[in-house]
Design a protein with these regions (language model features):
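Hydrophobic positions on the long internal alpha-helix
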Residues: 123, 127-131, 135, 174-175
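C-terminal helical subdomain
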Residues: 201, 205-251
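Conserved active-site helix of classical SDR/Rossmann-fold NAD(P)-dependent CH-OH oxidoreductases
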Residues: 30, 125, 169-180, 223-227
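Rossmann-fold cofactor-recognition segment
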Residues: 52-69
Length: 251
């Protein structure tokens, strides 16, 4: 993707990247900064890892804390009246020895379930609550949250990973419902979830051994794939889960 490849948005596009300090979020921020149509990028995360990236403004945001989300949107609305593109690039699968994907129901933990759902489902939904009203009605706008193929109920043939699978399935349903309400209020707006593929980030690092090299994307390659999908979304694509190659994944 070069500086002229993001063609379906307005000529002065304002963007918010939630989770901009992560591998995919950082790559998306850097790639979007190269797009001629992008005017402002609001880089939202707990810490600023995009220092020096053109067009970016750092906005502190903790996706697990609703007052932090409210504070972030207030800072954004002080600088712009619209958001043409909102990408939620947050998510968690594991954290230390105590939080690992479950191989058996015997490994299920209330604390871990709550933590996974807080980050993977509730956080992105609250982002939508406060950010969707800024999407313009006179041109295309997109809300996209990173999901995963393993969140597809139809695609689940091997089980396991209870919390992660379920949290992503719940995210897909949340965005589906959001898309229905959004289409009534803003017919030019699209709300989707995206499967980025297996990306060489901290999230996938422990599980990369079985992934063929050609199927393991760098964050930069993943960002190019995702922006291409987003750019090509028609309004009737709203409410679906899309893979990195533009194919619809059944819920």
């Amino acid at each position: 993707m070069n500086s002229r490849d993001l063609r379906s948005f307005s000529s002065e596009c304002d963007v918010a990247i939630i989770g901009s300090s992560g591998g995919i979020g950082k790559a998306l921020t850097e790639l979007l900064s190269q797009q001629e149509c992008v005017r402002n990028i609001f880089s939202c995360s707990r810490t600023d890892h995009n220092l020096g990236v053109d067009k970016t403004s750092f906005i502190p945001l903790n996706i697990t804390d609703e007052p932090s989300i409210i504070s972030a949107i207030n800072k954004i609305t002080a600088k712009t009246t619209k958001l043409d593109l909102v990408i939620v690039a947050t998510g968690t699968l594991h954290e230390g020895e105590s939080l690992q994907p479950e191989k058996s129901w015997r490994s299920l933990s209330e604390d871990n379930l709550l933590k996974i759902f807080q980050i993977n489902t509730i956080g992105p939904t609250l982002i939508a609550k406060y950010f969707l009203d800024l999407m313009p009605k006179d041109c295309k706008s997109v809300f996209a949250a990173l999901s995963a193929r393993v969140g597809s109920i139809e695609d689940n043939s091997i089980g396991g990973w209870y919390a992660y699978r379920s949290s992503k399935a719940a995210l897909n349903m949340m965005v589906k419902s959001l898309s229905i309400e959004l289409s009534r209020k803003n017919p030019n707006a699209v709300a989707v979830t995206l499967h980025p593929g297996t990306v060489d980030t901290k999230l996938s690092k422990p599980f990369q051994g079985s992934v063929p090299r050609d199927n393991l994307f760098s964050p930069q390659t993943s960002a190019k794939h995702l922006l291409k999908v987003i750019d090509e979304l028609p309004t009737d694509a709203t409410g679906h889960l899309f893979a990195w190659d533009g194919q619809i994944i059944p819920f």
